[in-house]
Amino acid sequence: MGNRRLAREHALQTLYYADTGKTQGKDINEYKEDFKDSLDAAGFEFCSGIIDGALEHQAELDKIISAYAKNWSLNRMSVVDRSILRMAAYEMLFSPENTPVAAVIDEAIELAKKFSTENSSRFINGLLDQIKKERKNGQN
């Protein structure tokens, strides 16, 4: 498994815990430290950047996701799907990494296939594709 994919998996787990409030008294930075040994320095920095960025921009990301999630409120989405969407939207719109958008979407789909329901990958793909099109048109 690639270092960035593993970093995204760890970021997803941390964002999941943050969203559900099941941090068991742990600070988000403590969760990040739990993953330090399984990633190289670049992977750990990438993982931390996604976590910090998605949390910092969460209100903006939620507005953007909500705008494209026709007939789906954020609260109606599974926590896993919501976390994947926040991560991917953050990477697409705010991350300084400049990861190609197609790669971000592909990784989000793979995370959904691994950690969510059968239909989640299609839902996530469709929503992120809409964000990509708007971004390309300069509207985000």
From Swiss-Prot:
Q: Identify the stretch annotated as signal peptide in this record.
A: none
User: What GO terms fall under cellular component here?
Assistant: cytosol
Please tell me whether the keyword Zinc is annotated for this protein.
Answer: no
Q: Which UniProt keywords apply?
A: RNA-binding, Transcription, Transcription antitermination, Transcription regulation
MF terms (GO), sorted A to Z = RNA binding
Which branch of life, at top level? Answer: Bacteria
Give the similarity note. Answer: Belongs to the NusB family.
Q: Which NCBIfam families match?
A: nusB
**Listed name of the protein:** Transcription antitermination protein NusB
**Biological classification of the source:** Bacteria, Pseudomonadati, Elusimicrobiota, Elusimicrobia, Elusimicrobiales
